Structure formats: C-alpha cells, structure tokens
A protein has these predicted regions:
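Short, contiguous strand/loop micro-motifs
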Residues: 32, 39, 124-128
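Membrane-proximal N-terminal amphipathic helix
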Residues: 35-62
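Generic N-terminal leader/processing signal
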Residues: 2-3, 34, 48, 124
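Alpha-helix termini
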Residues: 19, 30-37, 72
Length: 136
C-alpha cells in the first residue's frame, strides 16, 4: 500500500478562496484609509497658509484670489508665497471661497472635496482650520 502525501484539489481551492476573501477585505479597508490620508494632507496644506495669510492682513494687505480652484497665485500682494495646490485628481479638493478684511485683521478661506455641506470641507480663519462634512 502506498502512502499519498499532499493536498487534494478541493483543499487547495478552499485555501485560495480564503486568501481571495481576505485580500478583498484588506483592499476595501485600505481604500478608505487612502481617502482619509488625502483629506488629512489637504488639512495640513491649508493650515500651512494660515500664518502667511495672517501676516498679510496684519500688514493691511488683502488676500488675493487663487488663480485656479486648485491653487496658484500669490496669497497677497508683495509676497512670493503662492496658494498651495490641492489634490484634484483622486479626491477633487478645490478652493471654494475667500474673504479678507485687513482693517479687522480677519480672513477666511474654504476648500471642499465635492459638494459643500456633505463632502469633507475645511474652513480656515485667523483662529485656525476647522473640518466639517463627512469622510474624515
């Protein structure tokens, strides 16, 4: 009598199916983390503008409008720092609105990743940046 060693075809197929299910679950959970990372990057990018914008309004300079919805152009007149670019390919981040009142040393700029009110939105003022919407 010979001793058979090895796995049957059914056992191998079951193992492959289990690996496939685990890979599917892993990929699904990681794609959500990727979007959260893009959103966190947008928040960091917008927070980096705040000290420059605050310096502009303290110098009684009005903030200038970005050249495109994803950034570009000087933050205010007389400086070389530009509005930073936002991730537009994968998450569709874009600047929505900009207001500044140099006499009051106040400003506000808003960026969103989709439809304002439901999508992740960041509102920055002289006191800080605030996240709102879903997807964080």
């Amino acid at each position: 009598m010979t001793i058979k060693r090895g796995f049957t075809l059914i056992e191998l197929l079951i193992v492959i199916a289990i690996i496939g299910i685990l890979a599917g679950v892993l990929i699904t959970s990681l794609s959500g983390q990727r979007v959260k990372a893009y959103n966190a990057n947008a928040l960091t990018t917008l927070e980096s503008v705040k000290p420059i914008a605050f310096g502009c309004v303290l110098d009684n300079k009005e903030l200038t409008t970005y050249t495109t919805t994803d950034g570009g152009g000087a933050i205010c007149a007389g400086i070389t720092e530009n509005w930073p670019s936002l991730e537009t390919t994968k998450t569709k981040w874009k600047y929505e609105s900009l207001t500044s009142v140099p006499d009051d040393a106040t400003f506000s700029y808003v960026a969103t990743s989709g439809v304002a009110g439901t999508a992740p939105t960041i509102t920055c003022t002289q006191t800080g940046c605030v996240k709102s919407g879903t997807g964080w």
